[in-house]
UniProtKB/Swiss-Prot annotation:
NCBIfam families membership: kdpA
Name used for this protein in its record: Potassium-transporting ATPase potassium-binding subunit
UniProt KW keywords: Cell inner membrane, Cell membrane, Ion transport, Membrane, Potassium, Potassium transport, Transmembrane, Transmembrane helix, Transport
Topology of the protein relative to the lipid bilayer: Multi-pass membrane protein
Organism domain of life: Bacteria
Function: Part of the high-affinity ATP-driven potassium transport (or Kdp) system, which catalyzes the hydrolysis of ATP coupled with the electrogenic transport of potassium into the cytoplasm. This subunit binds the periplasmic potassium ions and delivers the ions to the membrane domain of KdpB through an intramembrane tunnel.
Annotated Pfam families: KdpA
Subunit and partners: The system is composed of three essential subunits: KdpA, KdpB and KdpC.
Source species: Flavobacterium johnsoniae (strain ATCC 17061 / DSM 2064 / JCM 8514 / BCRC 14874 / CCUG 350202 / NBRC 14942 / NCIMB 11054 / UW101)
Length: 573
């Protein structure tokens, strides 16, 4: 086994080992138990609640949680939108970067608001330092929103019969101060000491070894990059994201950034077990997610290590694997692992160019986002999986002739309808958007305001790969991921507006649905467990849930995958 694979395995195992105590700590934070950080953060949180006039001890029902969540996001959207729209005239712009167009500002504000960071611009020339700071703020709060929603779900599952499910603002502030901030500080310090810039000075002029005079972009990158991964956001400070030598300088920083994006999604699963005092249930959920993750990782890593068969046919040896679009300091194995970690977890950061990945890798990256149920982003990963638990419980109950129950609450028609709607919405948004873009491209439609030229102009690659680029853009948007096949010309009104709409719908409806289900179930009468109760903490139920995910989430996309990356794969044979 080569050292590259050992590095991949080592990082994965280390993250799991560290996620267990972090999960215990997260459960304590949401339960209100004492932690080591109380003396530091108690005064800060009291000050925040005092100046904002919020009573953090006031209990809310699920509708009040949603009202608070949605209203605060509206405020943040307009704040970010106007900063981006007028950044050229605002302070902290030493490189004199211009203001964004309205459609790009709309897309960017929504993208960071919903924890996606789709980025139809390049960081070096597209945003000022003030805009970067505002976007970094959104990276914190968008992750905090997802974690607060998960905390409400935890409370709903724990309580026997109640309408009150904690306080949204309490969960949100604690998520930001006690979890995201300390972890981000650790990651940022590691990055700074490894060579990532942390300054408010503008571009630096240098002379290369061959005598060329060039300008190198810098800025407060380390802080931005830390929360981009800890909060599973993924937006790059620089255009090349974590493939950029200043954003991810060494193999060590690559490991830190991989750990950073995986640690909270892993820990949230274990936190569920500690919070409910049901460790076995959490282990089953983690096991199902890990099996799904490995089924996506192994083909990807092997495909990248084995290289491009078209190049092999030319008699050219590929001892280092498929290196197109890869960074030499990382190599194909860990680049392939990162590409699945970042798409499964919904981070969306890249340390290689996904557009240059082998077709099998591209298919696995797409499938990771299409399934959207293994690990997932900060908090929302649990919400997505919760939907499939409800569906699996309902289907299992029908199969054995028992009333569907989950944690002592009956699953009835209303909850199943909500869960089914959420499960169907994801493929609908992806396939409808891709169909629209494909129609315009196939007819070479003159787009007018929507695009400067005919629709084929936004594709740099024809045929199967061009279709994959359009499919990937909408899949990434719907999964709130943010990575892309960057051969697509996406900075224009058509892509900025359509993906912006998909981003909004695919973020907030899948949060509203699980919160509604959890709130409805929490208000129902608790039914004690009996011999006839379907146990949800067994491997059999885990397999059932995996089957539901495979049938509903994965098979819905097979025709689209067959037209794109799978067809491309067979053309290389």
């Amino acid at each position: 086994m080569n050292t590259e694979l050992l590095g991949v395995i080592g990082i994965f195992i280390l993250t799991i080992v560290l996620a267990i105590p972090l999960g215990k700590y997260i459960a304590k934070v949401y339960l209100g138990d004492k932690t080591l950080l109380d003396p530091i953060f108690n005064p800060i949180e009291k000050f925040i609640f005092k100046i904002s006039g919020i009573n953090s001890a006031e209990e809310m029902n699920w509708k009040q949680h949603l009202k608070a969540l949605l209203s605060i996001n509206i405020v943040w959207f307009f704040l970010c939108f106007f900063v981006l729209l007028f950044q050229g005239s605002l302070p902290l712009n030493p490189d004199n970067n211009p203001s964004m167009t309205a459609d790009l500002a709309f897309n960017t504000a929504i993208s960071f608001l919903v924890n996606c960071n789709l980025q139809h611009y390049s960081g070096e020339s597209g945003v000022s330092y003030l805009s970067q700071i505002v976007l970094m703020f959104l990276q914190f709060v968008s992750a905090g929103i997802g974690m607060a929603a998960a905390a409400m779900i935890f409370t709903a599952m724990k309580e026997r019969t109640t309408e009150k499910l904690g306080n949204f603002y309490n969960y949100f502030i604690k998520s930001c101060t006690r979890i995201l901030l300390p972890l981000s500080a650790i990651a940022a310090v590691a990055l700074v000491f490894s060579g990532t810039p942390m300054t408010f000075e503008g571009k630096d002029a240098i002379t290369t070894l061959q005598g060329d005079h060039v300008e190198v972009s810098r800025g407060p990158a380390a802080a931005f990059i830390a929360i981009k991964h800890i909060g599973t956001n993924g937006g790059g400070f620089f255009g090349a994201n974590s493939a950029h030598p200043l954003e991810n300088p060494t193999y060590f920083t690559n490991g830190v950034e991989l750990w950073a994006q995986m640690i909270i999604p892993f820990a949230m699963i274990f936190a569920l077990g500690f919070y409910l005092n049901k460790r076995k249930l959490a282990n089953i959920i983690f096991g199902v997610m890990t099996v799904g993750f490995l089924l996506l990782v192994v083909p990807t890593v092997m495909s990248e290590i084995n290289g491009n068969p078209a190049i092999t046919k030319m008699g050219i040896a590929q001892t280092t694997g498929a290196m197109e679009g890869k960074e030499v300091r990382f190599g194909p194995a860990i680049s392939g692992f990162w590409s699945i970690a970042t798409t499964v977890i919904s981070t969306g950061s890249v340390n290689s160019m996904h557009d240059s990945s082998m077709p099998v890798s591209g298919a696995m990256q797409l499938l990771s986002m299409m399934v959207n149920a293994f690990y997932g982003g900060c908090g929302v990963g649990i919400l997505n999986y919760y939907i499939f638990i409800i569906l699996a419980v309902f289907i299992s109950g029908l199969m054995v002739g028992r009333t569907p129950e989950f944690l002592g609450k009956k699953i009835e028609a209303r909850e199943v309808k909500i869960a089914a709607f959420i499960a169907i919405l994801h493929p609908l948004l992806i396939l409808a958007g891709t169909a629209l873009a494909s129609y315009f491209t196939a007819h070479d439609t003159a787009m007018g305001y929507w695009f400067n030229g005919n629709a084929t102009g936004w594709l740099n690659n024809p045929g199967n790969h061009g279709f994959s680029e359009m499919l990937y853009e909408y899949t990434s948007s719907a999964a709130n991921n943010g990575s892309g096949f960057e051969g697509l010309g996406d900075n224009n009104p058509f892509w900025n507006i359509t993906t912006g709409i998909v981003l909004l719908l695919s973020r907030f409806i899948p949060i509203i649905g699980p919160l509604a289900i959890a709130g409805l179930l929490a208000g129902k009468k608790y039914i004690p467990e009996s011999a006839g109760t379907l146990k949800t903490d067994t491997s059999i139920f885990g397999i059932m849930t995996f089957a539901v995910i495979a049938i509903i989430a994965a098979l819905s996309f097979f025709p689209a995958l067959a037209l794109g990356p799978l067809a491309e794969y067979f053309t290389l044979k």
